[in-house]
């Protein structure tokens, strides 16, 4: 519903951007023609293909599937309501994987067809002439990238002083610089106080910044202010399952709730709300139910922002280390010194590795640049395996690739890098 359709559209956006950038390399194309019906059809085809594949794998493994709306009746029973009937299922064990849904802002009429959520925006009913995105987090910026590439004039309003709160500022900077060129406006430290229908069409948005109020008109508004766990409307009040003050189901390292035979995984079980974390948790829960020794003990969970450039990080961020007074040292390699990135016409990236100053082991990695999401896995492996700077720098990486910037960053830390001139520290 979210990951695959959005990444399908982001791929289209990336190709369109790369096509445009080829002008700097002596290659030009006529203006691309965007068939929105064709784009929508392609996106739906990919989703259907993957969904049917999952159904076939379940059938091959003799997993019975029942389509319907499930609600708990007790700690050991659920009711499944489908179009034709209701049935009660008694279970020995249950795994709750109900996910999350888009958060809303009080006073913004989400029932208005021109007020979109990340889910309804992916339906691509139409491409608005101008679009305001409320929220400068990963969902808002990814959707802004998509709609900008499809022809919308995009603006973003973020309540906090910076885009992508939580990410290291040095990683966000290259993306912010590019988005300022692509987007019409980026309103920071801005509160949206109201969204009202305009005549004859569109929406009038009232904004507040530094105590001053202004109004702007947009064809559509996309609310992207985070997600909330789907713990309501599934009958949890009929059980003794504990929900914390943020609405998440409380689980232990085995993904078990306070009810011995009920487990919870994914967005409904707590942050970070990431599909790959949910998959890992699901495997843990399944193994525990089967009597195997398993628990969720991941030292590193990668996060990726699929904008252009992409941003990815894993482990401790530099901002987190500073905030929590965690001692660290780092090695950074600018992609302006990477032959592969220069050949691609993309020199804005950087790879950063954060090390424990005593053991020299990797405790965090941050990357910004094309394909950062594909590159971050090496960082996750380095953290999980306890790799130190020497382990990474002495591992031969293929040349010319973006992946070798990971080794280069470790070499910078070690003082052995040859792709950059860094004066030796005195003493």
How would you label these PLM feature ranges?
Residues 1-4, 8-18, 290, 306-317, ...:
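Flexible, glycine-rich terminal cap/loop adjacent to redox cofactors
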Residues 139-160, 177, 181, 256-263, ...:
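Active-site substrate-recognition segment that forms the wall
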Residues 3, 96-157, 182-186, 237-239, ...:
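Glycine-rich dinucleotide-binding loop and its adjacent helix/turn
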Residues 1-127, 160-164, 170-173, 178-187, ...:
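Glycine-rich flavin
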Residues 30, 64-67, 71-84, 89, ...:
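A Rossmann-like FAD-binding core segment of flavoenzymes
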Residues 134-137, 167, 267:
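Glycine-rich Rossmann-fold phosphate-binding loop(s) that bind the pyrophosphate
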Residues 111-128, 215-289, 374, 382:
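FAD-site-proximal beta/loop scaffold in flavoenzymes
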């Amino acid at each position: 519903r979210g990951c695959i359709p959005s990444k399908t559209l982001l791929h289209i956006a990336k190709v369109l951007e790369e096509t445009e950038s080829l002008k700097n390399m002596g290659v030009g194309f006529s203006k691309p023609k965007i068939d929105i019906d064709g784009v929508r059809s392609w996106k739906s085809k990919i989703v259907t293909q993957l969904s049917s594949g999952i159904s076939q794998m379940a059938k091959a493994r003799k997993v019975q599937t029942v389509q319907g709306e499930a609600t708990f009746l007790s700690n050991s029973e659920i009711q499944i309501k489908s179009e034709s009937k209701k049935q009660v299922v008694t279970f020995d064990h249950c795994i709750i994987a109900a996910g999350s849904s888009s958060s809303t802002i009080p006073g913004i009429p989400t029932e208005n067809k021109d007020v979109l959520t990340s889910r309804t925006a992916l339906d691509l009913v139409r491409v608005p002439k101008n679009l305001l995105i409320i929220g400068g987090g990963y969902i808002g910026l990814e959707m802004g990238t998509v709609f900008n590439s499809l022809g919308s004039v995009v603006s973003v309003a973020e309540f906090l002083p910076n885009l992508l709160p939580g990410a290291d500022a040095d990683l966000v900077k290259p993306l912010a610089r590019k988005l300022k060129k692509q987007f019409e406006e980026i309103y920071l430290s801005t509160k949206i106080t109201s969204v009202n229908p305009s005549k004859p069409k569109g929406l009038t948005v009232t904004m507040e910044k530094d105590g001053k109020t202004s109004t702007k008109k947009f064809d559509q508004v996309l609310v992207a202010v985070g997600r909330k766990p789907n713990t309501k409307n599934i009958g949890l009040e009929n059980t003794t399952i504990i929900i914390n003050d943020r609405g998440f189901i409380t689980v232990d390292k085995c993904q078990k709730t306070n009810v011995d035979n009920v487990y919870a995984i994914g967005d409904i079980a707590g942050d970070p709300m990431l599909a790959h974390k949910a998959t890992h948790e699901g495997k843990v829960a399944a193994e525990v139910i089967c009597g195997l020794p398993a628990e969720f003990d991941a030292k590193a969970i990668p996060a990726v922002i699929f904008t252009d450039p992409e941003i990815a990080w894993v482990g401790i961020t530099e901002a987190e280390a500073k905030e929590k007074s965690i001692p660290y040292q780092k090695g950074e390699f600018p992609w302006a010194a990477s032959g592969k990135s220069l050949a691609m016409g993309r020199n804005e990236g950087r790879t950063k590795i954060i090390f424990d100053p005593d053991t020299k082991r990797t405790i965090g990695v941050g990357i910004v640049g094309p394909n950062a999401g594909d590159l971050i896995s090496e960082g996750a492996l380095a953290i999980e395996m306890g790799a130190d700077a020497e382990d990474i720098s002495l591992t031969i990486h293929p040349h010319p690739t973006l992946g070798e910037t990971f080794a280069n960053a470790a070499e910078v830390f070690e003082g052995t890098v040859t792709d950059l001139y860094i004066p030796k520290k005195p003493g």
